Amino acid sequence: MAGNKRKRSNASEGSDSQGNERISSLSANEATQDFPRGGASSLTPLEYKEAVLEAKKDFMESASGTAELSKKTRPKKKGSKKSSKSELDNEENLKVHIQSLRYKNITPGSLILGQIAQINTLDLAVSLPNCLTGYVPITNISDKLSDRLDSIDNHAEDNAATEEEDGLNQIPDLMDLYKVGQWVRVSVTALGSENTTKTGKRHIELSLKPQDANGSAPEAADFVAGSMIQAVVSSIEDHGIVFDIGINNYTGFLSKKHINDFPFVEGQSLLCSVISKEDRIFHLSLTATSTKALEVMPSVQAILPGDYINVLVTDIKESGVIAKYMGVVDVTSDIYHSSPVKGEDLEDKFQLAKSVPARVLFVIPGDPPKIAVSFLPHVLTFNFATPNTPHPDQLDIGFIVNAAKVTYVSSSLGVFCDVGVPEISGFAHISRLSDKKVAGISPNSGPYKVDSTHEARIINYSYVDNLYILSFQQSVLNQQFLRIEDIEVGQFVDGTIAKLIPQGIVVTISEGINGLVPSTHMADIALQFPERRFKVGSSVKCRVLSTNVLRKRVLLTLKKSLLNTDLPLIYDYEQATPGTQTVGTLARIFEDGAIVEFYNSVRAFLPVSEMSEAYIRDAREHFKVGQTLSVTIVSCDPENRKMRVGCREQSWDAKRLERFENIKAGSVLSGIVLQKTEDSVIVDLGDKVTGVITLGQLCDGDLNKCSKVMNKLRASTKLAEVLVLRKDTSKKLISLSLKKSLVEAAKENRMPINITDLKEGIKYFGFVRNATTFGVFVEFCDGLVALVPKAYISEEYVPVPSAVYKPQQSVTCVCLSVELSQEKAFMSFKPLAQKQEKAVEFMESKYDIDNPVDETIKKTYDYVAGKITWAVVTSAKASQLNVDLAANVHGRVDVSEVFDNFGEIVDPNKPLKRFHKGDKIRVRVLGIHDSRNHKFLPISHRVSPKQFLELSVRPSILNMEPFSMKEPQFKKGDEVTGFVNNVSKECVWVSLTPSVNGRIPILDLTTDVKELNSLQKHFFLGKAIKCYVVNAEDSITLSAIGPLQGFENLTPGSRLVGKVTNVNEAGAILQLPGHMSGRVSRIDMFDDYDILPETKFTRNNLVGVCVLSVDVPNRKVALSARNSRTQSQPVEIKDKEINSVDDLKIGDICRGFVCNVANQGLFVTIGHNLIARVKIGELFDTFIKDWKPHFHVNQLVKGSIVGIDNDSKRIEMSLKQSKIKDSSEITKTFADIAVGSNLDGTVVKVGDYGVLIRIDGTDNIVGLCHKSEIADAVVLNISKLYSSGDKVRAHVLDVDSEKRRIALGLKSSYFDSDSDISMSDNEEDVEMRSEDQSDTSESEVGSKDDVQSEEVENLESAGDEDEEEEPSALQANGFDWTDGSTVFDKLADDTEDSEDEEDEEPKRKKSKSDRFDDEEKDLDEIPSTAADFERQLLSSPNSSLLWISYMAYHLNLNELQEAREVGKRALSTINYREEDEKLNVWMALLNLEVAYGTEDSLKEVFKEACAYCDALIVYEKLCGILIKGGKVDLADEYMQLMLKNFKQVPSVWIQYATFLLNNDKAEKAHGLLERSLQSLPKSEHVGIIEKFAILEFKNGDPERGRTIFEGLLSSYPKRLDLWNVLIDMEMKQDDPSIVRRLFQRLLALNLSTKKAKFAFKKWLAYEKNIGDDEGAEQVKRRAIEYVSESHSEN
């Protein structure tokens, strides 16, 4: 670059002195900095830019002058012409031209910033700069979307029938992927015409694929923070979106916090902003992450459309602005994008040499590339994924602007106009100014000068340019339609026939808009030769049926019935109102109706019953598709887009409606025949009310006689007597009959209308409704039907009733019986054996009454609803009174029908206590009590002695006049009285009335937990409960503790009962009455913090609580379960309740739970919203550098209050033992410590000199154990043996009373002489073992460290070491720490093999393993104290057995969290090579969480275990643990996960199938085989099928196993191994016949001699085993025959 600048200075020697001075100084400066140090320039940026501009100007002037001089004076020489041309080219190349995007200068590979203007079915229309439009085919959006389209295409070819059923096999809707106005970066892929004709429009094909839109060969280095990048949604994850950015080995990631509810779809291509780059991941955003422009790009190729950059203005012209980026890259902005105000003087807006922000608009490839930028505000500030907000005054396309004022004229482009919309201008291209050719335009003269006004029409809108595209052409102004959106449904349009096609007629409506007249809409009748009636080029008047903007389709009609109708048009479901009459076209016809189509694809269903007044059997026989009908809307459901119409007259006047209402079924009327159809007669009954007589109802004879009657009838024939059979009020249909037998019966009032009219033993006239195999159905009036059973049809046997009795046939029958409760009646065609009168008398005798209590009652049917009578109590039960109304009439009084309100009840536990046997009581009859179903039934027929009466003695019922049987209506908040009738675990059911029950949830029963824990004892049958209605919509829900339970009704101090729904170490969530929930924090669970939550708070447990506070707006309730809060009697409080700072004073000792472990210290919750801070210096009496491992969240700590700030409510706390110890806790003083004694202590510091130990039970007395006294062997690294916080036992070596110093020793030899180990104060109840069982010799520690590296090397070189056998029952409180023996234990079958291998190991290896014999003995005998465990772990840190035993030790002490911590320590301590040892610890942790943890904690441990161990083994082990623990459902979930993640492993399928079959889920297991075959390779198919078959034999259905094996053998008949397995399975089924058949089939195959010998030998062994000697002999004979036959063949 320095060389170039020196060249420029030399070329400008002829310029003015000032310019020379500047250039020379710049050159001198550059000459001194060819190799600058640090890259800093001595010029300021502004001075540097001014110098560059001045140098460029002088160079251009000098170059121009030299060229002119050489051209005039230099003589022509050979080659001078070429030289001159080269100089002109150089001069032209130096000029920077303002780039506008035109079709001519676009090349494939050009990158452009655009906005989506239109979304079509198969492509996107993208608005480009300079009023251009390009199209992105659906195949150019992304590779992922293209692959999906390919799969859809392949699926359609394979199985077209299922394509509609599978939603995944439908073409994606681009409307779900993009929005109009959304910004995108596109790459030009092809240029051409939409069709091959000369008038074809220019077509620009674009691509949104990242590999195209991010440059030809995008590299990761080209994108920096703030760069724009086009990315494709690759997958949608829980934490964000993964993108494909088109760069190999790099991906993009959009965090969930940057999503902002944007709808993401896989395969979607979006424009994003780069936030940062980490490793191979670009962090993206959909919004601008910074308002700061990009100052520097990695390279020129990195500049892409959409990038927000700062450019330096170098030149301002009338047509635009020229600028530089980074001082070397030329960029331009044309008049479209230089200023939003067209006609504005650009020199007033831009200043030379000033840096301004701009956004890159397009990049056209070249050398150098042509780069354009935009300064328009809406381009600078856009959001990438969401469209810009439309202008509130935006005009529609097609709108005519009466006075568009010209504001700027571009002689080469056109004119810019003010259309009256702020911030949006209009632009009319020069070709759109007039229908005639415009030679030229000028801003100062002519018809299109500045400030001239014109009538203009908006023909489009350019999103990127923010311009309306205008046309001044008169032809466009006069054009009726510009777009399909301008065409209204139902509108009349004039068009010209363009062509005739098989589907119909294509009509040109306007320029570029065609419509189709379907063949069914050419005329009201079907045309065989439409070309004779319609000629191409002729004008037609049409009506618009529907429009589809997306598919660009307009449907028209030429039907005269639709063109000339004056009826209202239906083009929207919302517009359709019942009763409206309109015209429609039949689109489809079915047997039971038809689909009628109106305008805008609105459709309705026309039932066959609404097609005509006459009966129509099949609509297809009377109507044709395309037929026009006048219909009336019957009903419409706009929400579900359903409509029902009818052809029958729907509008009835009052007189006609009154006539219809007065006609009753069973009445006899007169009428006049209106018309006849093929099989019916329509009769006028007066006032335009009509009825229908079907053919079979014309007479009592058969169909032939009925047809003769039909032939005699004529229109206007008077019918004197017709019977009304049925009346359908909803359809306004009346069915009539002319059968004389029915008419006469109706006239004599012997025609039954409802089932109560039927009397047993009475003869009735009817007609056959239907004949079936079991009897004949007889119909009477109003649809009443009775059954004649097959046995009562005739005296003779009738095998097929339908052969004798035909529909509509007249019959006479006798009533056998009537079942009113089931509304059934039975008839007989047989004659009565006795006279009818005797039969009636016999029937009446059934209702005789015997010795009634009320002597006014004569018959049982005198007991009707509302009857007040007397009854005698026979027994008083808990929930009802049993009474007698007569000797043969009984009843009951339900307890809910005794009292009017709860106040009348003397003893709620025994409400019926005042009633005694023999009491005579006044009762009122309510109905019938169905004792079988325990239901209340109203009285709808005569009461018989067999029925049980439902009675009432409630005063309000006895005094009710007039009596009404209306059920009481319950509403929310009502006070009611309920009587217990049933008790379940979740609720108590109470009776409110004999027929209405209510439900009281268990939490709404009482606030006494004891009562709820023994429901049956306190809520027994019949108990009265005062309740309040909570919900009465679907079922009645009640509450016995208050009227309306809600957050507003809760008050602090209220005592409730809650049901535990979730519990963890921080607290518990409880369900409260009234569907509320509350939280009990850890400090509010107990008055003693030592009690674990699990002792009281387990899921579904009931707990008494007290309300502490209620946050009504946020629906939060704080609760307390402390006994001091929930119980009235005083209780012992160990940890007092602290409610405010006022409850504390400095020096108070209190306990709390750690809520945060921060870098500054601990934060401890000690009360309600009270958190105390513990500084690091207040944690321990001595300094401990790594203090965090000593604390964890929810840990219980004890401390002393050292500071209180009442104003800020801040509390300071100290955990130092010296500040919180009571005098009673200090058991030793300095004087009590004697030389030679053994003491327990805690390591407080480890240094090079030794270990500092704080002695337990003292006032912070610390002793020193010198490094020489740590172990009997030399210890090189003390920190490997001890760390701060370790519990140790030390021997006192020396005591210096003056200096208060104590010398201690930790050597194991100091403890050898002790025959009895003293116990610490806190371990008095723990039985200690003798010295040879409890302590591992400390001398072993040093020796093992010395040989550790040697042993590791030997182990690695020798291969696998002997495996330790896992303990089978390391238990704590009955808890098995191992995974036990399950179907997933892969090593179970190899135990004996491994033992054999151990015996064969070389002696060298065995001698090496002998080194660990002592350690094994120690591990087998588990230590008893934490100190013992810590000592042994020093010598055996890799022993999983010891670590698990340590966990069990803590669990025995109910220290659940400590057990977890030990497990975590074990995982971090055990050497990474000891994979089996680590796996054992993981299994122990999983066992722990399964037994004591939650599902969330189990899931967390499981995920960690999968990350560090073989995931498949962890899955199998966990499933085995869950199965053994009885958690089958959870095991099923994890098995399904295992199957999903390891579906290529055959054993996983077998394990899951085994589990399902063992747990009675055979149907689910049967589907696994087919699924496994789809996932496993073909080489595994035979094996997996065989194993599934074996499973069926062992655990499932043996028959299914046989079927599977038979399928295998049909494919592999000579696979002896398959035959062998099948025979083995059948041998276990104990059916010798099946086994023998299998052997016979096997030997019938062409087997080799060796295979046949094997088969005979196996068969013979089987016969001997089952003890069948004859069978064995037969096998031998068969073998001899087989051998002889084989020899003869050979």
From Swiss-Prot:
Residues 72-83 have a biased composition (Basic residues). Residues 11-32 have a biased composition (Polar residues). The modification Phosphothreonine is found at T1391. Residues 1348-1367, 1390-1400, 1412-1421 have a biased composition (Acidic residues). It comes from the Eukaryota. InterPro entries: HAT, NA-bd_OB-fold, Rrp5, Rrp5_S1_rpt_hs11_sc8, Rrp5_S1_rpt_hs1_sc1, S1_domain, TPR-like_helical_dom_sf. Component of the ribosomal small subunit (SSU) processome. Involved in the biogenesis of rRNA. Required for the formation of 18S and 5.8S rRNA. This is rRNA biogenesis protein rrp5. It comes from Schizosaccharomyces pombe (strain 972 / ATCC 24843).
